[in-house]
């Protein structure tokens, strides 16, 4: 069926900010879809609130709106643009829920907009637990016994009837939000109450637990002519009971017999046909390991995290083809762009094994609840490809960047047997390492399979890895054993440990004996047909399929898995850098390990190596490709950390040189550079042990900001008030960086701002200054940023521009750099310099219209700013106001305190743009799901340090007609100063009148809660904050953010005055 000619303009809804459960995979899907629709000649309108995406670049769609994805704003855009159709299936749960809302509000009918891809009835059938159950019964597909409930009592009654354990699944939520496994009534009451609250339709499904079954996923495609195929099947290493986004996953399935595979494949195809889905769909099934019994767990009628993984695992571009199916093309008339010869109807076949391991944020959240269950907690993931399970698993382990280079964590050697068994049984994010440790201690794989319900086949592979370790230790220097270990994915570093050598010695032995990897192509057809994709993985075999081209090449290092502090912003910069390298006439080669992102789409670069970002793996590619040089500026700290070892090995680092990178990162050198350039900085010192730190702090004076050098996202950073706190910090946190000392700085409370600059060594272009709304003390990644600055005088802006230029030239920066300033009493201090692209690059590129990463890449390749048409100095300001606001994923992370400080906690960002600051702020708050009605009540619970300041806020809330509740000390203070505040208890003293009760009953619309600089962990405060997070009401832990919210409310409210 040819494509439809009755529709001309199509609107695509993006997935908004990155949160746990909905990450960069939707930028990849959305980008592919928009380009595919444009390729077919349609006019594309895109709405997405997240500026850090490639998808929101001007050239991806014909019109791009970076606006909140809310009914109010999307309706406005629909009325203005009048598209013929809407494609919501590429925007994750956000896109689907938005389509449902638009339909229910009658907007789609009013404007005659047709839904493409998946009909509303199918979305409803897949998402609404009751309808899904009915459909499965009609198709005679088995599902676990279950009951839909709307109250906690109904849940308890059903669970009593079928017996525990049971699983709670809220309707229409994302990544298992609010759900969980309950072993008894007490757990059920707690989880069901929370789940009903979080479900937009107050509905949960209570179902019999089938934990322990194998979890299998099928990624399926169907078109309007009812052609359907399985793109990829995948098997979870972890059994049912752990969210698939938090599971280690292998593709293709490893332990199924042919009969089982056919049975589940037939079920998946039957379901997608019954739902009449046009496009991609993901079916999750549970298989009883002891019989042919299976259950259908759930169906996602949209492109998902698993589809991104399936696309990268097979090379089959699901989102691109799904978009084309949505406009009427069929699978048997589209060519598979990978082979260029076979049709899209042809099911991919794999002659390799893919392993995916999730990346968790617990390195940032020490207090977080690490137990895994049906609610997702991972922020990102890595993927690795090998010729066997051992190889792909070990490559994935060293891609994680959690300080391991094998399936082993050295600190687990200290764990007692009892603690070890508990961690093996009760899965946490690091269970793989505990199981591997148990095998090293002699636990049998039969025992472990019994304890974990993980298939013995996988445990046998871990046993094989251990046997190879013993083999290596027994045969030091043996070349045959070395070959065998390399074929099974061992890193040089691990072999070096076992041989008591250095990794470089092992590497030398390898090279002498010509034990080097070959690179195999990912071609979707197991080498059956000719294929031309430049997409490779390494393995230790014979035939190399990656041929070095005659063109001079440049390698760009990506940023690895998405984690807090290093998000999709760096992928954005990587992709732009590649575009510039290609435009300059070089061959652009990307190395990266993240399956979710645009940079690992093989059509982006000339060659893609899907490999871990470690010195060994990068060096192997460099030795084959012999590039002109390597670009490390755009891959975040991951790539910067590789600059020194690569440079020592004789690799040319393009852009700012390693010695200069060091001057920005090494404290003493940096202080000296600032002194030489005559630029003020907060007084500080370095310390290598506890006594030195205390000595330094006495000299500088408390409060001080302490942190290790060389970290990203403010890891292990704290503001300390006194000597005791400092001593405890030195004892607990300093492990963060043993070779690098700890920095002790005077903590200056002032206005903070930051600058991204691009320098060619002579001229320095400053696209703009971003002013932070929160004062110093809140990590820049968690602050709201405003461009252009609203409160900085011309003189201060000139000073900032002058210091920026001095620093860029003084540090011999070629390419990009990011500088953070704090301003107190009209003095501008430099807090830190990052000699690389930072997380604000996409935002600033969008608001100034300067493709910053491309400009910087051209400089790195030798083309000056003047040659590119840019002048030295501060770029003229935009006439709109733009606000970048952080978005957090606290609802997914139990026991993580939502108090903001110098350690970064946000997972994503949104942008609000308008003609005034108030309007831009309103949009930013709406886009980040912080909705405040124009009247209501606000709760104040304020630390003594900030009461004076909170008084002004309370007066303003009072003036616009808000009711004020306050805890004891705060209420007394406010009432004494003429603001009427109603007393409320902190916690539990009287249950009807404590803060959680007010929040529960909907009497409070926001909470403002500050703590002093002392920031010790306070349980009451944490409980108050989490009650706001659970209820989804705005929580402000910085008065500056609350002040911004009041400005918005003031601009939208009316005054009532007597005449």
From Swiss-Prot:
Positions contributing to Mn(2+) 2 binding: 298, 300
Domain MGS-like span(s) in chain numbering: 930-1059
Record-linked InterPro entries: ATP-grasp, CarbamoylP_synth_lsu, CarbamoylP_synth_lsu_oligo, CarbamoylP_synth_lsu_oligo_sf, CbamoylP_synth_lsu-like_ATP-bd, CbamoylP_synth_lsu_CPSase_dom, MGS-like_dom, MGS-like_dom_sf
Pathway connected to this protein: Amino-acid biosynthesis; L-arginine biosynthesis; carbamoyl phosphate from bicarbonate: step 1/1; Pyrimidine metabolism; UMP biosynthesis via de novo pathway; (S)-dihydroorotate from bicarbonate: step 1/3
PROSITE patterns: ATP_GRASP, CPSASE_1, CPSASE_2, MGS
Annotated binding of Mn(2+) 1, by residue: 284, 298
Residues annotated as binding Mn(2+) 3: 820, 832
Keyword set includes Ligase: yes
Catalytic activity: hydrogencarbonate + L-glutamine + 2 ATP + H2O = carbamoyl phosphate + L-glutamate + 2 ADP + phosphate + 2 H(+)
The enzyme's E.C. designation: 6.3.4.16, 6.3.5.5
Alphabetized Pfam families for the sequence: CPSase_L_D2, CPSase_L_D3, MGS
Gene3D superfamilies found in the cross-reference section: 3.40.50.20, ATP-grasp fold, B domain, Carbamoyl-phosphate synthetase, large subunit oligomerisation domain, Methylglyoxal synthase-like domain
Residues involved in Mg(2+) 1 binding: 284, 298
Keyword Metal-binding in record: yes
Residue numbers spanned by region Carbamoyl phosphate synthetic domain: 547-929
Alphabetical keyword list: Amino-acid biosynthesis, Arginine biosynthesis, ATP-binding, Ligase, Magnesium, Manganese, Metal-binding, Nucleotide-binding, Pyrimidine biosynthesis, Repeat
Residues binding ATP 2: 707, 746, 748, 752, 777-780, 820, 832
Region (Allosteric domain): 930-1059
Cofactor binding comment, as recorded: Binds 4 Mg(2+) or Mn(2+) ions per subunit.
Complexes and interactors: Composed of two chains; the small (or glutamine) chain promotes the hydrolysis of glutamine to ammonia, which is used by the large (or ammonia) chain to synthesize carbamoyl phosphate. Tetramer of heterodimers (alpha,beta)4.
Similarity remark: Belongs to the CarB family.
Function recorded in the entry: Large subunit of the glutamine-dependent carbamoyl phosphate synthetase (CPSase). CPSase catalyzes the formation of carbamoyl phosphate from the ammonia moiety of glutamine, carbonate, and phosphate donated by ATP, constituting the first step of 2 biosynthetic pathways, one leading to arginine and/or urea and the other to pyrimidine nucleotides.
Protein name per Swiss-Prot or TrEMBL: Carbamoyl phosphate synthase large chain
Biological source species: Streptococcus thermophilus (strain ATCC BAA-250 / LMG 18311)
């Amino acid at each position: 069926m040819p494509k439809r000619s009755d529709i001309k303009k199509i609107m695509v809804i993006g997935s908004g900010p990155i949160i746990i459960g909905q990450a960069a995979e939707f930028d990849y899907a959305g980008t592919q879809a928009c380009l595919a629709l444009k390729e077919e000649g349609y006019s594309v309108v895109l709405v997405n609130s997240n500026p850090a995406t490639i998808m929101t670049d001007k050239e991806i769609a014909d019109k791009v709106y970076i606006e909140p994805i809310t009914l109010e704003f999307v309706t406005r855009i629909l009325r203005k643009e009048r598209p013929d159709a809407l494609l919501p299936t590429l925007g994750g749960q956000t896109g689907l829920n938005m389509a449902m809302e638009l339909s229910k509000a009658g907007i789609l009918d009013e404007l005659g907009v047709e839904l493409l891809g998946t009909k509303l009835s199918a979305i409803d059938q897949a998402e609404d637990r009751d309808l899904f159950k009915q459909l499965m019964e009609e198709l005679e597909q088995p599902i676990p016994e279950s009951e839909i409930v709307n109250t906690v009592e109904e849940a308890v009654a059903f669970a009593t009837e079928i017996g525990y354990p049971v699983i709670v699944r809220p309707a229409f939520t994302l990544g298992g939000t609010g759900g969980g496994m309950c072993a008894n009534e007490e757990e059920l009451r707690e989880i069901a109450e929370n789940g009903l609250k979080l479900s937009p339709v107050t509905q949960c499904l209570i179902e019999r637990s089938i934990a322990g079954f194998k979890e299998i996923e099928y990624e399926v495609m169907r078109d309007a002519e009812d052609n359907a195929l399985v793109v990829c099947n995948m098997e979870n290493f972890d059994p049912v009971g752990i969210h698939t986004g938090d599971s280690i996953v292998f593709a293709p399935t490893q332990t199924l017999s042919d009969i089982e595979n056919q049975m589940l494949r037939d079920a998946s195809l039957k379901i997608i046909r019954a739902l009449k889905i046009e496009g991609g769909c993901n079916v999750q099934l549970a298989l009883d390991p002891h019989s042919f019994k299976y259950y259908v767990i759930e169906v996602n009628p949209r492109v998902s995290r698993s589809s991104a993984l399936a696309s990268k695992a097979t090379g089959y571009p699901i989102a691109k083809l799904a978009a084309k199916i949505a406009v009427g093309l069929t699978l048997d008339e589209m060519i598979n762009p990978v082979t260029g010869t076979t049709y899209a109807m042809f099911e991919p076949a794999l002659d390799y094994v893919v392993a995916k391991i999730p990346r968790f944020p617990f390195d940032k959240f020490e207090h977080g609840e690490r137990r895994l269950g049906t609610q997702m907690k991972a922020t990102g993931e890595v993927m690795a490809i090998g010729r066997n399970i051992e190889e792909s698993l070990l490559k994935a382990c060293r891609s994680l960047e959690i300080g391991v280079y094998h399936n082993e964590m050295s600190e687990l050697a200290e764990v007692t047997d009892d603690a070890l068994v508990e961690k093996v049984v009760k899965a946490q994010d690091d269970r793989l390492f505990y199981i591997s440790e148990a095998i090293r201690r002699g636990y049998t794989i039969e025992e472990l399979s019994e304890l974990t319900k993980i298939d013995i086949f996988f445990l046998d592979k871990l046993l094989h890895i251990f046997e190879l370790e013993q083999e290596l230790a027994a045969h030091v220097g043996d070349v045959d054993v070395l070959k065998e270990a390399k074929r099974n994915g061992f890193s040089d570093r691990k072999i070096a440990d076992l041989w008591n050598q250095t990794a470089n010695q092992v590497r030398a032995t390898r090279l002498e004996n010509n034990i080097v990897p070959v690179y195999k192509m990912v071609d979707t057809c197991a080498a059956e047909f000719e294929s031309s994709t430049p997409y490779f993985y390494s393995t230790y075999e014979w035939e190399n399929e990656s041929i070095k081209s005659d063109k001079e090449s440049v390698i760009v290092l990506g940023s690895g898995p998405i984690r807090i502090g290093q998000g999709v912003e760096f992928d954005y910069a990587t992709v732009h850098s590649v575009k510039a390298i290609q435009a300059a006439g070089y061959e652009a080669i990307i190395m990266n390990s993240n399956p979710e992102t645009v940079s690992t789409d093989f059509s982006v670069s000339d060659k893609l190596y899907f490999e871990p970002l470690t010195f060994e793996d990068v060096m192997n590619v460099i030795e084959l490709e012999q590039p002109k040089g390597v670009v490390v500026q755009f891959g975040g700290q991951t790539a910067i950390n590789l600059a020194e070892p690569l440079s020592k090995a004789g690799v040319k680092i393009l852009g700012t040189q390693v010695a200069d990178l060091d001057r920005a990162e090494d404290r003493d050198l940096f202080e000296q550079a600032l002194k030489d350039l005559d630029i003020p900085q907060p007084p500080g010192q370095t310390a290598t042990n506890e006594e030195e730190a205390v000595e330094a702090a006495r000299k500088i004076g408390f409060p001080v900001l302490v942190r290790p050098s060389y970290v990203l996202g403010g890891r292990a950073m704290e503001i300390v008030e006194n000597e005791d706190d400092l001593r405890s910090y030195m004892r607990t946190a300093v492990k963060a960086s043993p070779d690098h000392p700890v920095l002790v700085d005077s903590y200056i409370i002032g206005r903070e701002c930051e600058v991204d600059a691009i320098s060619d060594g002579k001229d320095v272009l400053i696209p703009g200054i971003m002013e932070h709304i929160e004062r110093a003390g809140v990590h820049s990644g968690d602050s709201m940023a405003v461009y252009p600055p609203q409160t900085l005088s011309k003189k201060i802006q000139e000073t900032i521009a002058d210091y920026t230029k001095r620093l860029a030239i003084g540090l011999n920066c070629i390419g990009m750099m990011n500088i953070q300033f704090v301003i107190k009493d009209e003095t501008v201090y430099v807090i830190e310099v990052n000699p690389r692209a930072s997380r604000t690059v996409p935002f600033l590129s969008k608001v100034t219209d300067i493709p910053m990463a491309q400009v910087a890449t051209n400089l790195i390749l030798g083309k000056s700013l003047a040659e590119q048409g840019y002048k030295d100095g501060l770029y003229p300001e935009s006439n709109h106001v733009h606000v970048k606001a952080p978005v957090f994923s606290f609802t997914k992370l139990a026991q993580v305190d939502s108090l903001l400080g110098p350690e970064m906690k946000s997972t994503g960002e949104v942008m609000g743009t308008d003609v005034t600051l108030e309007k831009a702020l309103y949009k930013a708050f709406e886009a980040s799901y912080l909705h405040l009605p124009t009247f209501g009540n606000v709760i104040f619970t304020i630390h003594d340090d900030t009461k004076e300041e909170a008084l002004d806020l309370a007066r303003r809330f009072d003036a616009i007609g808000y009711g004020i509740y306050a805890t004891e000390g705060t209420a007394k203070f406010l009432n004494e100063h003429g603001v009427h505040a109603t007393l409320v208890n902190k916690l539990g003293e009287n249950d009807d009148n404590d803060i959680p009760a007010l929040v529960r009953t909907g009497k409070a619309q926001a909470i403002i809660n500050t703590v002093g600089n002392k920031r010790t962990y306070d349980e009451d405060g944490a409980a108050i904050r989490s009650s706001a997070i659970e209820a989804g009401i705005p929580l402000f832990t910085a008065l500056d953010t609350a002040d911004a919210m009041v400005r918005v409310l003031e601009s939208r409210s009316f005054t009532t005055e007597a005449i």
